[in-house]
Amino acid sequence: MGLLVSRVLRCRDSSLLEPQPEAIAGASYIPGSRKRKRNSLEELATSSNVHGPQNQGMYPHQVLNYIYWKRVKISSNDAYQNLFLDGHDSDIKIRALGRTWCLHKVFLCQSGYFANILKGTWRESHHGVINLIIKNEDIDTRSLHFVFGALYTDADLSITPLEVPQVLAAACLLRVDRVIQQCEGIMKETINRNTVCSYYLAAETYRLKAVKTRCFEWLLCNLMVHPSVALYKEVDLKLMYLLALSSDLLVMQKEIDVYTTLKIWMFLYLNPCWNGTMKQLLQHANNWLSTHMAYVDNISFLESEEGLIFQPVFKKLRFQHIICDLTSTTILEQDRLIPMAWLSPIYKQQWLTLLRTQEYGVIGPQVINEQELEECTMRCGTMIPKDGRYTWKWSVGRLGFPLRVTFTRQCVILRQRCQRCDGSACHNHIRNVIFRITLVCFDSNKRVTFRKTTGYKILTFEYKEEQIVMKLDSDVLTFPMCIFCNFLFVNLGNAENK
């Protein structure tokens, strides 16, 4: 109990440690009698058991003085059991949420909240009882009990990950830094699909910046790579808005798949009682949307009363990378989810950009604009199931040029494909592209075990040219592995849709 005693002694204050008059029994206390107090403490020194029957009338400050003067260590288990759980020698009661705790001022003063309450004129107007009115619904009796108990022991008390947000809320209310730090450590180590959203909300509420950042990074990596019905049900509107906005979102396949993810998330948001598998989810979402829109004329779903709250999230889709192929455009039109007022300016913008590219021989972006990269790059990705050589292309429409990606255990290669795109912007033999390649490996718990990125770079390609854009150490690679790319072929913003 050495650390516990030192913590309590450091926060001792005469206004906290003096027994309250209403708690004193008659003649056993004589104000100002130092001789009597000194004699009683000398009598205590003859006993080796501070919790023995002869000492049941001791006040907590006497217990601490005894420990301090005699250099006797009492285990924190004894303090936790005898003083906290059994309530021996309690000099104050805390009432909250329908429960009463018999506690001790010398331990409560470790809480910044109670240290302030117990000062000044409090003891003049109360009778050894503090009534807490708690309006925070995250705090319950279990979390309060945990935080009170932590004041009586040096050891970290056991807590499950799912209980952490409630304990953190109680610790922040009572201002117990040690418990806040314990919660922060547990949260950092136990982020998974069952905890990530509750941790994120708690970290945002109670300003744990490092935890909030880790949770957001976990979601960026796993939202589309490891989709889950349970996870999607937990993501709220604000959080999904931030995820859809980010260029760091690890997108599986293409931008149309971000749209699909938002569609099934919206379905679950509006139908929280739906139970099924990820394989069933898209079909159910499509059927639900089709049935709903059968009774709606002239407007899209996002323009309906139910859909209005989702508009900010869907506006962050990069439609210029969705309408670049017929299949994706057909999906948008059939769903009638997106307002035509959003899409018409994008069609116009794409067409004018294509004409300018062909007319003036634009070779592509020549400077890196951070804001444009964050808002406008094409996001795409795929899974590498096992070791080997893989080659594929992502459709980039007529504003890009035919780019082929090759992955081997030694490197990643980008190449301008051999065939020309008649009538497209790729008639120029020399073209620029801004790109970023990111490789990620996960363990069985969906945690990132390996990550490597090129950062954003500009490459100039001549016709049929190939370039190695990332070299790899084959010894550190594990499979399956995910490869993600961000591309910007022209300086094309989403200005009409912001």
From Swiss-Prot:
Gene3D superfamilies: Potassium Channel Kv1.1, Chain A. Residues 90-160 form the BTB domain. Pfam families: BTB. The lineage of its organism: Eukaryota, Metazoa, Chordata, Craniata, Vertebrata. It comes from the Eukaryota. This is Germ cell-less protein-like 2. Pathway: Protein modification; protein ubiquitination. Its main location: nucleus. It is found in: Nucleus matrix. SUPFAM superfamilies: POZ domain. GO terms for cellular component: nuclear matrix. Keywords: Developmental protein, Differentiation, Nucleus, Spermatogenesis, Ubl conjugation pathway. Possible function in spermatogenesis. Probable substrate-specific adapter of an E3 ubiquitin-protein ligase complex which mediates the ubiquitination and subsequent proteasomal degradation of target proteins. GO terms for biological process: germ cell development; protein ubiquitination; spermatogenesis. It comes from Mus musculus. A motif (Nuclear localization signal) lies at residues 33-39. Interacts with CUL3.
